Curated annotation (Swiss-Prot):
The gene is infB. One of its GO terms (molecular function) is GTP binding. Gene3D superfamilies: P-loop containing nucleotide triphosphate hydrolases, Putative DNA-binding domain, N-terminal subdomain of bacterial translation initiation factor IF2, Translation factors, Translation initiation factor IF- 2, domain 3. Residues 401-570 form the tr-type G domain. Residues 456-459 are annotated as: G3. It comes from Xanthomonas campestris pv. campestris (strain 8004). Residues 178-229, 279-291 have a biased composition (Low complexity). Residues 546-548 are annotated as: G5. This is Translation initiation factor IF-2. One of the essential components for the initiation of protein synthesis. Protects formylmethionyl-tRNA from spontaneous hydrolysis and promotes its binding to the 30S ribosomal subunits. Also involved in the hydrolysis of GTP during the formation of the 70S ribosomal complex.
Length: 902
């Protein structure tokens, strides 16, 4: 390579980009302004050396040897013994200390010297450094030993102080016992000479007795000479002797135990048991009767009998009991420190029949707690709910304008969906079964005035909860009223929902293109519902539209946009999303699907979602056209996939950071809901049981299993069908759910003899097999009208027939004749209807029934006839009744069977 090698050429030779080579040259300390400058051989070698040092390689073997000479590593191993205290003994432990030190000679130090060191000088320098290091290690070990010694001395000093305090307390206690014994002993007995053994036996127990300190521990008072005494005196003397000997021997044994275990902070289990046995074992002779009698009345350790005596409470103990939403009777009794039977008795006195394992609600538990004299406080178990609330507060941000949410409400067949069809330029109503809406439809439409989100609600009476849910989450309600029909029941209900939700109302008078349209009639009828048009001086906008030809639709959109501007709708566009579930269903291919309306934040794919008692991760988002948007902002309805189950329509949803929090919140909510449901379903109160016993006689039960395509339809069907129940028949929905009819549904229906209702769903093969083998009544429906009508028919068939009595004729008794064959025969005039033979009759006297029986004989001109009509005279013989009088009325009636209906 020549002297005229440029940077560009050098880069080509080493196969390196020019920019990278310039950077490496700059890092090596050489500055070049461009790739066309010349690189000398010296600069090349300098660059090569820099690159070698950068990659950890020496430039030459000589340099590598010099690098190795700059570094020296010393290994050292040292063995020593350490003594460790282990309870009462000391243990010696061998400790091996290993040290490894590496010394590196710095370049500055080497460059500052005039000449390199000789091997002897290097060895002397290394030995000096080793000696200094060894001295530092010895100083460190000495410092640690002094620290350990000071710590041990502090511990021993603390033990001595504790032992001195114990001895001081023990001395004070013994002095107090001796003073108490002196106060309790009779003074004359202690001062007088002992004429018998009883006073002599009491003498050693006196604190003023002189021989007590010199008396040996094993001495017995029985060895003293004593005069004979009565048996009762001997017993008393034995008791007093035992008590006195106990005091002295216990003191000696306590002293021995104290000396044996003194100065030990931690004792083993065996030592603790031995110390307890020494302190607690009875004194006196082993097996003596006096010792056994003394042990039965009081503890053998007199030092513990005083301070630990039982004191009777002077006031009732009032406990503060924390009660959650529900609590079992056993748990409540444990918190009250009472027996479970006492709590059950208290509940029974309050009229609540509950077992010890049964759950009761918070109000009932609080009442029984107050009844038992304690205080009840509400337990706060909403830990995960608080964390969820904190997440929601963290998501607050800057608010921006959002599109309005408009709910279309009105009566059936007044053109709600058709009006929305025209706005969207699509055909929705033709796709609904029967031409009526049975789901909440959520759509967002981009108009020239901005984005508007529409909610289309059903108008049928069975979908009351759907309409209420739509009015709750909306900003503006558009009330559609047909100009030819006027105000109908569901129209009034929609007005009530809008007023209850506090949202503004816009009335769209539809079908004005029909011949019988009368918009003025609609305005007048809505006046009764306090909906006053602007023409009449009110604040409600009335827009005349035609969903068929499109008349007035633009005016309606202008009115919606104007109302939205007045409301100044704002929401947080970024951050965690939150909103409400509009509808939910179970798709066989996609799993649980929830239609949600985002109210705050932005909902994105991959977010963790908690929705009522369900949770999950958003796997996909779909709009009403089937497209998958990247995210959904405020006031935008979307379908969410990925939840753990089908949520309830109307549940709120919120996005959280992780799946763990979502799962914990969902499980806590499910537990609370299950406990509340158990408490609500249990018939606890006595009056409810008695009422059910009264109603149960003769009441028929129709069991149903309801499966539908969406959660809203399930809810509407349950409410509508259960409302058909009366005193004669009860509609019982044993199971309901979303999705197709499965094998478990068929088994439930077979076990309870229920009818299966499939609303827009079908049964699978296994379910159909069970239905056929068990003869289960399975019916498919797509219109809610047909469901209600057929359930009414089935329920009416269970009711059977009703026997009714119909009066067919009345005869007036004019005279009474006597017959040897029939007895009293009434001569009558038929004044109403017809009287027939062999029909039941009633005899009325002064409009009061005096006899009910059967017509035995009916004659006219001595001839038997089958019937006698109005205005004709006849003779009537009443079977088994001879007390007929003139002026009575004979009422002839017949019993007919009438089918009972709901």
């Amino acid at each position: 390579m020549s002297q005229q090698t440029t940077i560009r050429k050098l880069a080509e030779l080493v196969n390196t980009p020019v920019d990278k080579l310039l950077v490496q040259l700059a890092e090596a300390g050489m500055k070049f302004s461009g790739p066309d400058q010349v690189v000398t051989s010296t600069e090349k070698m300098k660059l090569l050396g820099f690159l070698r040092r950068t990659h950890g390689k020496a430039d030459t073997p000589a340099e590598a040897a010099s690098e190795a000479a700059k570094k020296i590593t010393l290994n050292r191993r040292k063995l020593q013994e350490v003594t460790v205290n282990a309870g009462r003994t000391k243990t010696t432990v061998n400790v091996e200390v290993r040290q490894k030190r590496t010394y590196v000679k710095s370049e500055n130090e080497g460059s500052g010297r005039a000449a390199p060191m000789t091997p002897d000088e290097e060895r002397a320098d290394i030995l000096a450094k080793l000696a200094a290091s060894r001295q530092r290690n010895l100083d460190e070990q000495q410092r640690l030993a002094e620290s350990d010694r000071a710590r041990d001395e502090a511990i021993q000093r603390k033990r001595d102080e504790e032992q001195a305090a114990k001895d001081r307390v023990e001395a004070e206690r013994k002095a107090a016992e001796e003073a108490a014994a002196a106060a309790s002993a009779p003074a004359p007995v202690a001062a007088a000479p002992a004429p018998s053994s009883a006073p002599a036996a009491r003498a050693p127990s006196s604190p003023s007795s002189a021989p007590r300190p010199a008396r040996p521990a094993g001495a017995s008072p029985a060895s003293r000479p004593a005069t004979p005494a009565r048996p009762d005196d001997r017993n008393n003397a034995a008791k007093h002797k035992t008590r006195g000997s106990h005091v002295m021997v216990a003191g000696v044994e306590d002293d021995d135990a104290t000396k044996r275990f003194a100065g030990q902070l931690h004792l083993s289990a065996a030592d603790r048991a031995r110390r307890s046995n020494v302190r607690g074992k009875p004194t006196g002779r082993p097996g003596s009767s006096s010792s056994r009698r003394n042990d039965g009345g009081r503890g053998s350790n007199q030092s513990n009998s005083g301070p630990h005596g039982f004191e009777r409470p002077t006031a009732p103990v009032v406990r503060e009991v924390a009660i959650g939403e529900t609590i079992t009777v056993a748990d409540l009794a444990q918190k009250l420190a009472l027996k479970g039977g006492d709590v059950v008795k208290a509940l029974f006195k309050m009229g609540v029949m509950a077992t010890i394992t049964q759950s009761i609600d918070h109000d009932t538990a609080a009442l029984v707690t107050e009844e038992l004299g304690h205080k009840a406080v509400r337990a706060d178990n909403a830990d995960f709910e608080d964390a969820l609330l904190a997440h929601a507060e963290d998501a607050q941000g800057e608010t921006t304008s959002r599109p309005p949410v408009v709910t279309i409400m009105g009566h059936v067949d007044h053109g709600k969906t058709s009006l929305l069809d025209y706005i969207r330029r699509t055909k929705i109503a033709s796709g609904e079964a029967g031409g009526i809406t049975q789901h909440i439809g959520a759509y967002h439409v981009e108009t020239g005035r901005g984005v508007i989100s529409f909610l289309d609600t059903p108008g049928h009476a069975a979908f009351t909860s759907m309409r209420a849910r739509g009015a709750k989450i909306t900003d503006i309600v558009v009330l559609v009223v047909a100009a030819d029909d006027g105000v109908m029941p569901q129209t009034k209900e929609a007005v009530a929902h809008a007023k209850a939700a506090g949202v503004p109302l816009i009335v769209a008078v539809n079908k004005i293109d029909k011949a019988g349209a009368d918009p003025l009639r609609v305005k007048n009828e809505l006046l009764a519902e306090n909906v006053v048009a602007e023409d009449f001086g009110g604040d409600t906008q009335f827009i005349e539209v035609s969903a068929k030809v499109g008349t007035g639709v633009d005016t309606l959109l202008d009115a919606i946009s104007l109302q939205a501007e007045v409301l100044e709708l704002k929401a947080v566009a970024d951050g965690r999303a939150s909103g409400t579930v509009i509808e939910s269903s179970l798709d066989k291919g996609r799993g649980p699907v929830a239609t949600v309306l985002v109210q705050q934040g932005a909902l994105k794919r991959g977010d963790y979602l908690v929705c009522g008692i369900q949770y999950g991760r958003v796997r996909a988002l779909f709009d009403e056209t089937g497209h998958q948007p990247a995210s959904a902002g405020p006031s935008i309805p979307v379908q969410v996939l990925g939840l753990s189950g089908v949520p309830e329509a109307g549940d709120d949803f919120v996005v959280v950071d992780d799946e763990r929090l979502a799962k914990d919140v969902a499980q806590q909510r499910e537990t609370k809901r299950r406990e509340s449901r158990l408490v609500a379903s249990a018939t606890n109160r006595m009056e409810d049981i008695l009422a059910q016993m009264g109603k149960g006689e003769g009441q028929q039960v129709l069991n149903l299993v309801i499966k539908a395509d969406v959660q809203g339809s399930v809810e509407a069907l349950k409410q509508s069908l259960v409302a058909l129940s009366n005193d004669d028949i009860r509609i019982n929905v044993i199971h309901s759910g979303v999705g197709g009819i499965t094998e478990s549904d068929a088994n439930s229906a077979a076990a309870s003899k229920a009818t299966i209702i499939g609303f827009n769903v079908r049964a699978d093969a296994s379910a159909r097999k069970i239905v056929e083998s068990n003869g289960i009544d399975l019916r498919y429906f797509s219109i809610i009208y047909d469901v209600i009508d057929q359930v009414k028919q089935v329920a009416s068939g269970l009711l059977g027939v009703e026997i009714r009595e119909e009066i067919i004729g009345i005869a007036q008794v004019r005279d009474v004749f006597r017959s040897s064959k029939f007895g009293a025969v009434a001569g009558c005039m038929i004044i109403e209807g017809v009287v027939k033979r062999s029909k039941p009759i009633r005899v009325l006297r002064d409009s009061v029934v005096v006899f009910e029986g059967e017509l035995e004989s009916l004659r006219r001109f001595k001839e038997n006839v089958d019937e006698v009509r109005n205005g004709t005279e006849c003779g009537i013989g009443v079977k088994a009744y001879n007390d007929v009088k003139a002026g009575d009325q004979i009422e002839c009636f017949e019993r007919i069977e009438v089918a009972r209906t709901l």
